[in-house]
Amino acid sequence: MRFTSTILLRVAVLLSLGGGSQTTSCTPGQPFPIPAYSKTSLQQTFEQIFETVSRSFDNESFHSTNVAIEVTSSQETLWSFYHAAKNQSSQDGSTVIGPDTVFRVARVSKLLTAIAILQLHDQGHISSLYDPINIYIPDLDPSTVQWGRITIWDLLNNVAGILDMYGYADIYTDFSARQRADLNLPPVPEDSLEGMPACQVDKSIPCDSAGLLSWLRSSRAVFEPHRINSNSNVGFSLLGILIERITGIDYERFISQTLIEPLHLNSTSFRPPHKNSGAVLQNDHTWNWDVGVNNPSVGLYSTPRDISTLLRWTLNESPSSLLNWFAPGFYAVGSHSLIGMPWNIFRTTAPLSIPNRPTTFNTVVGTLGPYTSVVVVMPEYDLAVSLMMNGALGHPHDILAKVTFPLVRAADKIALEKVRDNYAGTYKAEPRQKINSSITLSVSPDHGLYISELISNGSSILPVMERLASSKSGGGSNWIFQAVPTFLETKRRRTPHDRVVVNEEWRWTYVLDKPPGEGWNDWCLSSFDPVTYAGEPLTKMVFQKDAKSGRVLSVALSGYNITLPKGVQEAGIFAQLEGTSLDLHAQAGQEVLAG
């Protein structure tokens, strides 16, 4: 029996209530499974990046600069670029730059601290990330700072509203008299220096936790807690003290035992190696500077090889089974920036130049003296980039764009081609099913995989649903029914023909093809489960794939209670799949919404 208009109207009403009128700027992200790369799949892109980056570093302003860039997937390092300073007299360390050259990696140190905190929380040593920090460090009080309102989560996300740095970054102690004079700052009486930390006045004295806590008790807040994002290296120093209080182990030893050694980061430490193995500038005192209690935020020394190993771990693992480490926790400055633990998250449509397809970059960036380090993680593409430099750089916007933008474009093309080859096509009922039903899935750069045709028992469903959904939404007729992976796999079953089948779940949603950026068109409400039929989700599709080859064999439409083989299959493919289809609530061959 065919769909009746009453049934279609009810479905359309439920869809419009469940998800709202979504415009193309609300197209779901991650329109493909996580891609994989071969040794050659990105080769042409890397050749282009090499030429572009090489030209940049040929500039005279970089003649006294050492540079190391690596790109890795979750499986292996895919590409590297090393640039040694042409002016070798500017260097006091190694004049050959490679994967094992040691750099000071500044705020990239925060990655290890954040991982350690999240693991301790996962293991139950920290009861809640929303615990106030003064529960664990009571000697922060008494203070004018509201430590009872500042949580571990606030410190991880840099929204505690507290001071940024301790023991450095003070113009009086870190600038020369000439530089201070150029700023026309007033003279400072000698007795006013008595309140400054001893480790700031004399850099040969490492800053310690007792001095930090004493200094914080007399400090004042920068902002009200969890009101606005403002970087705080001091916050990560407190997280380092928290680790020590919980574990009874020195921060540096704990990080070494739980992360550096298990991950075989053999050239990573909190102590400077011999300068002959490092990227060290002539007359630079930062290389050997012991930052003490600031180690959790800026103290680490590491190599491109080790950082790529760490980034591979972040792509493969999560420090927490309870949360998505890459997800944002708070707003940052600007319309494209968010904050995470400890990420600075940048979302932009610039790489793909498609208004509804933003790319998310999880970054950590920082400098310490002449050393600059950046890591960029792109989880949806299974890629990460590290950049380490000593010498001239400024903010690394330009170099990052030259590396990441063409990389994202190439990775996106690979991912969509994989979707087209594996999932796109027509899935049609076999004659033995005795029903005229099919679904056609297509691929576009804007929307990834989408339903371009749906036939139920001889009736074309999408045009009717588009019209009815439009009448309920108040405008627009060009609806796109986009499918996205859920990253859920259901049962693996072995068929009578000894074929192992994987059931891979996807969901589809609908967006209205209106231009973004007009009025409230960018206001997005998301639901991938807006309506069910007899308890089965209408928007659920389950692809049945051969576990060995990865080839898609069929798709099961849960709400319609039917499994449709893909395209031209070998004889009897549906019979081979019997016993592997989903346990739906009606017999195979019946469509639930057909009567």
Swiss-Prot record:
Induction: Expression is induced on squalestatin S1-producing YMG medium.
Superkingdom of origin: Eukaryota
Matching SUPFAM superfamilies: beta-lactamase/transpeptidase-like (SSF56601)
UniProt keyword Cell wall biogenesis/degradation, yes or no: no
Signal peptide: 1-23
Single Gene Ontology MF annotation: hydrolase activity
Entry-listed glycosylation sites: N59, N87, N266, N436, N457, N561
Record key words, sorted: Glycoprotein, Hydrolase, Signal
InterPro entries: Beta-lactam-related, Beta-lactam/transpept-like, Beta-lactamase-like_AB/R
Pathway info: Secondary metabolite biosynthesis
EC number: 3.5.-.-
Recorded family membership: Belongs to the beta-lactamase family.
Function: Probable hydrolase; part of the gene cluster that mediates the biosynthesis of squalestatin S1 (SQS1, also known as zaragozic acid A), a heavily oxidized fungal polyketide that offers potent cholesterol lowering activity by targeting squalene synthase (SS). SQS1 is composed of a 2,8-dioxobicyclic[3.2.1]octane-3,4,5-tricarboxyclic acid core that is connected to two lipophilic polyketide arms.
Name of the protein described by the UniProt record: Probable hydrolase M10
Organism for this UniProt entry: Phoma sp. (strain ATCC 20986 / MF5453)
Name of the coding gene: M10
